[in-house]
Amino acid sequence: MVTITGCALCDALVILATLIVAAYLYYAVRFTYWKRKGVVNPKPLPVFGNFLPSVLQKRSPGQILWDIYKAAEAPFVGFYIFARPAILIKDPNIIKHVLVKDFNAFSDRHASAAESDTLGSQNLFTLNGAPWKYLRVKLSPTFTSGRMKKMYPLVESCAKQLQDYLKENCNTKAIEVKETTAKYATDVISTCAFGIESNSLKDPNAEFREFGRKIFEFTRYRTFEVMALFFSPGLVKFLNGNFFTKETTEFLRKVFWDTINFRESNKISRDDFMDLLIQLKNKGTIDNEDGEVTEKVDKIDKDSHLFEFTGDNLVSQPALFFTAGFETNATTLSFTLYELSLQPDLQNRLRSEIAGVMKTSNGKPTYEDVFGMPYLHMVVSETLRKYPPLPLLDRVCLQDYKVPGTDLIIERDTPVFIALLGLHRDPQYYPNPERYDPERFSEENKRQRKAYTYLPFGEGPHNCIGLRFGYMAVKTALVHMLAEFEVKPCKDTPIPLELSTRSSVLATTSGIPLTFVKSTAQVS
């Protein structure tokens, strides 16, 4: 046997020392990438770059990007996802170029799922390139205002069930609004996306709610897995990372096809998302009945081979709707109720607006009524500023790109991020940013605000396709809750809130118990 020193132990020590030196030199060179480009960056750590706090689950990925945002007064900041260089864009003018003006250079997202995750990898959130574009165009008629108006009765029915739930429980105990709003959001998504009445508010063991919990149950491993899905495609492949577990996939698949088969056998139509998916399955397109301008479909059918509306490709669409919809709607609702409980003057002003609409509509507000309340929109907008459900936007640079007004060239394949917590809580754009103030979104203040500093739904061709639905679900619930109840903090309400260091979406470490009292100013 050939040895280096004639001593096995000494050989092992030499090899170990060589590996340590090689690793040190690799990281020493690798971690000078941004310095060599003249880009400011927080000091990275060997192996982990700037993501050790996320690996240790002391800071969520969104909070890490917030920390990086605050690390330097610069239009952009370099950082390292383990050993991979990435860049955080801070300047609103550059953000505009990334999201809109130069979209073709940044049209792909960085988030990814393993190919074996047949539901998680075949939707608008994770698809890139021509398949994403084709799917986006085909789905765009789903979320027009006309379609939302047709789905409104389904959402309103869930809001009335939420109102009934509060009536039954308001006088006995404080209500945990995180769980209550999650049940409401689950009922809304299950009825609109899957055509199933899950009855989560009535049944504590409802299947849809149980699977929703599992998706967002952030164990130590799940936290690391989701972090990889957003930030490290290499780790996703190594871990075989999934948005949906095998159990969840089988559940959603069964619900979907059972519903499809029942409707087609019995010729049932319900004006929901499932009806539109049946159109896609049978015709390859969705009728744009209300005539609203959507993504252009001309010349897109030549790419139909890139994405077929069959099998799990179909199931993945309501699966994403379920995942992206229920948690974001629930957190927006719970944060809004929390802030209104702490500021009764804001709550009373909103209740007064709701009471006026209830009076003119004889207690039956329409879709137009809900979307026609200016102060309600200001309140929800301020919640989305302070608590953006997904606290980051992610892109990948698809070609060497010279940043306008600078000498920096972002190299191809570089991950590009926008920190919404940083942007939305930057005192330069929002004075006293920790203060919850809906007046920031008055028409006058909106006109004065710098563009591209408010991005809860993203912007440009990659913006959230379901934003109208999200607004409808949240606003309808608030109208029916505050029409009859005052919401107040109780002795167990956490003040201030502590944000979770594990969750990929913005969430609190604990529950949010609040007290609901029948309003003396109710109008029905």
From Swiss-Prot:
Keyword vocabulary terms for this entry: Endoplasmic reticulum, Heme, Iron, Membrane, Metal-binding, Microsome, Monooxygenase, Oxidoreductase
Pfam families per the UniProt record, alphabetical: p450
Positions of heme binding: C464
GO CC, alphabetical: endoplasmic reticulum membrane
EC number: 1.14.-.-
The protein's required cofactors: heme
Compartments, record wording: Endoplasmic reticulum membrane; Microsome membrane
A single GO molecular function term of this UniProt record: heme binding
Membrane topology designation: Peripheral membrane protein
Entry-linked Gene3D superfamilies: Cytochrome P450 (1.10.630.10)
Enzyme class: oxidoreductase
Family, as annotated: Belongs to the cytochrome P450 family.
Protein name in UniProt: Cytochrome P450 6k1
Species of the source: Blattella germanica
Gene name of the encoded protein: CYP6K1
